[in-house]
């Protein structure tokens, strides 16, 4: 077990190619965002209490360790031949029932699901001998914007609890180290348990968000034609960071309604919509080849920008854009800052811009000002980069970064990233 305190950080995600086509068994590609969720784990002054704080959603709840239903849940925990917690494919109904009863009384759904995820993972990865601890989550990701904030949180919790339970080793790689592309047991363990955490939030998630948050880089995924067959997933851990502008239109959307709309188009104009979906498939496959190039550089980035523009046009043809998203694209194109497309389901939500290599910062700021004047929120971030990592207090001279009061009181996302982000703190470790 690592000495407390420590901080875990995991990225969010955006889908860069293949939205909507993925529903029809076509490949899609998601990539990590440099915006992250951060989890501070520190010892509690009360050895009998575990406390979970999530200031960004105004959650602050404590439990007496002895009051948690350890004995009721124990019969339903299983272990593999190495005596490690066995990872179920689904939530265990009996554990769900016990925790649901235990958490009865939460009126705020977001608070309920966060506590449910936390306790489900805690009681599977630790035991009743656990000491009192404080867990504080901060997010530089917009919450509820389809950018994987719940998966990032789940990955942070799974990593911390697995490390404290002694189920994984401490990471040792630094930011600029080349990552192993082979299967890494510790990351596989984190990924699978974080999917269980995601199921606590969402019921039946695809597993893509937590995979990107765990492994970083980018992931190509493809659903199979039958539920019995596992989806195809290819991790691109060493996909390099590319400058990105993320713009949240703040327009609410219904993913289910947008998917249903494409379904109706497909039923009415099958040959046309099939051609569009096939074009998106070919586009995603081309993007994958470009992204896997070991000599990836400016030329390959330019190709991705061209594919971004094509993909947006195809999504417009499917009817899933929105005037706000088109406004983002028009403003971006007017300032010539890069290639812009909607990301995710569309119908509102977010757009991404792959920023041109030679664009001046003042031009980007002018575009951002115009986005803000339209009521949107923009984030200068990057695409790709590292997955889950840990910052250990013994590696850092500045103890204030592990101060609970400072961690809770960062005033905004910029303050969090300035203090903890990998751009400024080089002591982060990765698997």
From Swiss-Prot:
ATP binds at residues 13, 139, 144-150. Keywords: ATP-binding, Cytoplasm, Kinase, Lipid biosynthesis, Lipid metabolism, Magnesium, Metal-binding, Nucleotide-binding, Steroid biosynthesis, Steroid metabolism, Sterol biosynthesis, Sterol metabolism, Transferase. Its EC number is 2.7.1.36. Induction: Expression is up-regulated in response to terbinafine. Pathway: Isoprenoid biosynthesis; isopentenyl diphosphate biosynthesis via mevalonate pathway; isopentenyl diphosphate from (R)-mevalonate: step 1/3. Its main location: cytoplasm. One of its GO terms (molecular function) is ATP binding. PANTHER family: MEVALONATE KINASE. Mevalonate kinase; part of the second module of ergosterol biosynthesis pathway that includes the middle steps of the pathway. ERG12 converts mevalonate into 5-phosphomevalonate. The second module is carried out in the vacuole and involves the formation of farnesyl diphosphate, which is also an important intermediate in the biosynthesis of ubiquinone, dolichol, heme and prenylated proteins. Activity by the mevalonate kinase ERG12 first converts mevalonate into 5-phosphomevalonate. 5-phosphomevalonate is then further converted to 5-diphosphomevalonate by the phosphomevalonate kinase ERG8. Belongs to the GHMP kinase family. Mevalonate kinase subfamily. This is Mevalonate kinase. It comes from Candida albicans (strain SC5314 / ATCC MYA-2876) (Yeast).
């Amino acid at each position: 077990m690592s000495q407390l305190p420590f901080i875990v950080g995991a990225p969010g995600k955006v889908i860069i190619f293949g939205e909507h086509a993925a529903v029809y068994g076509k490949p899609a590609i998601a990539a990590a965002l440099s915006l992250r969720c951060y989890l501070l784990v520190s010892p509690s002054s009360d050895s009998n209490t575990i406390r979970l704080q999530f200031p960004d959603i105004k959650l602050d709840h404590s439990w007496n360790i002895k009051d948690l239903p350890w004995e009721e849940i124990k019969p339903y925990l299983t272990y593999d031949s190495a005596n490690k917690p066995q990872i179920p494919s689904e939530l265990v109904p009996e554990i769900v029932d016990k925790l649901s009863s235990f958490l009865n009384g939460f009126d705020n759904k977001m608070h309920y699901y966060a506590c449910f995820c936390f306790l489900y993972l805690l009681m599977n990865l630790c035991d009743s001998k656990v000491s009192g601890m404080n867990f504080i989550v901060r997010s530089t990701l917009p919450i509820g914007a389809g950018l994987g904030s719940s998966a990032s949180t789940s990955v942070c919790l799974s990593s911390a609890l697995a490390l404290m339970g002694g189920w994984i080793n401490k990471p040792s790689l630094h930011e600029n180290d080349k990552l192993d592309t082979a299967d890494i047991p510790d990351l596989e363990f984190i990924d699978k348990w974080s999917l269980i955490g995601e199921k606590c939030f969402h019921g039946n998630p695809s597993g893509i968000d937590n995979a990107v948050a765990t492994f970083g880089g980018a992931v190509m995924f493809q659903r199979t034609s039958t539920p019995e067959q596992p989806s195809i997933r290819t991790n691109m851990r060493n996909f390099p960071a590319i400058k990105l502008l993320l713009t949240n239109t703040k327009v609410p959307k219904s993913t289910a309604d947008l998917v249903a709309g494409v379904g109706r188009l497909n039923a009415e104009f099958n040959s046309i919509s099939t051609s569009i979906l096939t074009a998106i498939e070919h586009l995603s496959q081309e993007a994958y080849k470009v992204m896997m190039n070991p000599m990836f550089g400016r030329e390959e980035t330019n190709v991705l920008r061209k594919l971004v523009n094509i993909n947006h046009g195809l999504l417009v043809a499917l009817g899933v854009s929105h005037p706000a998203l088109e406004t983002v694209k028009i403003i971006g194109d007017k300032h010539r800052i890069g290639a812009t497309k909607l990301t995710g389901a569309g119908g509102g939500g977010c757009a991404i811009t792959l920023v041109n290599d030679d664009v001046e910062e003042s031009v980007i700021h002018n575009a951002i000002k115009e986005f803000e004047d339209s009521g949107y929120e923009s984030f200068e971030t990057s695409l790709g980069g590292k997955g889950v990592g840990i910052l250990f207090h013994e590696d850092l001279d500045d103890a204030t970064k592990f101060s609970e009061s400072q961690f809770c009181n960062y005033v905004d996302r910029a303050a969090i990233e300035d203090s903890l982000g990998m751009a400024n703190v080089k002591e982060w470790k990765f698997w």
